[in-house]
């Protein structure tokens, strides 16, 4: 009986530790990544907000949120993207 109680205790501790570790990794996983960029400039008045992709993504990107709720990936090295980001930061 003591062996099964000890085994159960070890099993419960292992499960608790695994759940804690997986929760930590889940918090760091990127939610959105860009795999391609929009090919042309979109009108600035369509943009409501933006966020940058996580560093774990394969490509860097800026994701613009449009006023209609769409997400659009843009190349952060493009001049117009940098201007939109700067303007959004100033208006925040």
UniProtKB/Swiss-Prot annotation:
Protein name as catalogued: C-C motif chemokine 3
Report quaternary structure and partners: Self-associates. Also heterodimer of MIP-1-alpha(4-69) and MIP-1-beta(3-69). Interacts with CCR1.
Q: Which organism is it from?
A: Macaca mulatta (Rhesus macaque)
Disulfide bond positions: 33-57, 34-73
Feature type site, description Involved in GAG binding: 40, 68, 70
Question: Where does it localize?
Answer: Secreted
Its lineage reads: Eukaryota, Metazoa, Chordata, Craniata, Vertebrata
Q: Which GO CC annotations does the UniProt entry carry?
A: cytoplasm; cytosol; extracellular space
Q: Which domain of life is it from?
A: Eukaryota
Query: What is the annotated signal peptide range for this record?
Result: 1-26
